[in-house]
Amino acid sequence: MSSGGLLLLLGLLTLWAELTPISGHDRPKFCYLPADPGECMAYIRSFYYDSESKKCKEFIYGGCHGNANNFPTRDKCRQTCRGK
């Protein structure tokens, strides 16, 4: 196969992997918890997994308490709750 064909195949596989979420059975249970800013007054940009939209969304975390559906980056949220 030519190098162009290999690059096309690699691109298609990458696209497929990005668009195919993991099954709900493999997702940690805390991914289904709602965003919880906690009780403190800090202003920390964080991300949570929204199980209805199946997307990681931004929210502001107060810095304490909250729940485990709280990630420092969108990528970490995706890796944990979407398998990306």
UniProtKB/Swiss-Prot annotation:
Matches recorded under Pfam families: Kunitz_BPTI
Which Cys-Cys disulphide bridges does the record give? C31-C81, C40-C64, C56-C77
Q: Where in the cell is it found?
A: Secreted
The organism of origin for this protein: Daboia siamensis (Eastern Russel's viper)
Q: Report the sequence similarity comment from the record.
A: Belongs to the venom Kunitz-type family.
- The name of this protein is Kunitz-type serine protease inhibitor C3
State the tissue distribution.
Expressed by the venom gland.
Give the PANTHER family listed for this entry.
KUNITZ-TYPE PROTEASE INHIBITOR-RELATED, SERINE PEPTIDASE INHIBITOR, KUNITZ TYPE, 3
Q: Which residues form the BPTI/Kunitz inhibitor domain?
A: 31-81
- The answer to whether UniProt assigns keyword Cytoplasm to this entry is no
Q: Which SMART domains does the record associate with it?
A: KU
Explain the purpose of this protein.
Serine protease inhibitor.
Top-level division of the source organism's lineage: Eukaryota
Site annotation (Reactive bond for chymotrypsin) points to: M41, A42
Q: Which SUPFAM superfamilies match?
A: BPTI-like
Q: Where is it mainly found? A: secreted
Which Gene Ontology cellular-component terms appear in the entry? extracellular space
Give the keywords, sorted.
Disulfide bond, Protease inhibitor, Secreted, Serine protease inhibitor, Signal
What are the GO MF terms of this UniProt record? serine-type endopeptidase inhibitor activity
- Which Gene3D superfamilies does the UniProt record give? Pancreatic trypsin inhibitor Kunitz domain
**InterPro entries from the entry?**
Kunitz_BPTI, Kunitz_BPTI_sf, Prtase_inh_Kunz-CS, TFPI/VKTCI-like
**Signal peptide positions on this chain:** 1-24
